[in-house]
Amino acid sequence: MTDSMADSKTDSKTDDMTGATAPLVQLERYTRFWNTGPDGDRDRLAATVFTDEVEYRALVGLLRGPAALADFRDRFVSHAGPATVRRREEPEVHHGRARLRWEILTGDGTSFATGTDVIEFAGDGRISGIAAFLDRAPEGFDPTAHD
């Protein structure tokens, strides 16, 4: 992280006026959520990252609530094996939204897929909505199989 980024208001832990968690902090937690299995501290992490009504919209469908996102992650890992989500670049944030470009790496470090999440923040700084787009789909992925 550059010094200028460390000094920016968006990198502080909370907004002094509202007490809301800063977007870049939440995006770091968001990435950590996708990399935390059921044996980790995922429920506590989810409560700090997501609103109770968070909506996740992707080609695979519409998911509602942190438990549905955790289940989606667990089903993916049970099917594909160990996987890690990493950010491809620094997220862009403005007007209560963020664009986060990600990559999923398999257990051996092979790139599985890349994508972009457009994330909406609630007034308290937690994530209330995610629209997930595939930039490079996994090999053999059929987008019509999830209609």
Model-identified regions with their sequence ranges:
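Hydrophobic pocket/interface hotspot
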Residues: 30, 45-46, 54, 65, ...
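Hydrophobic alpha-helical core bundles mediating ligand binding, dimerization, or RNAP-core interactions
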Residues: 27-34, 50, 73-76, 100-102, ...
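Short, flexible active-site loop motifs that bind/organize anionic cofactors or intermediates
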Residues: 36, 59, 117
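A beta-strand edge to alpha-helix "cap/lid" segment located at domain peripheries
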Residues: 2-3, 15-18, 77-147
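Short acidic-aromatic low-complexity motifs
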Residues: 17-49
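A solvent-exposed, acidic/Ser-Thr-rich amphipathic alpha-helical stretch
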Residues: 24, 43-96
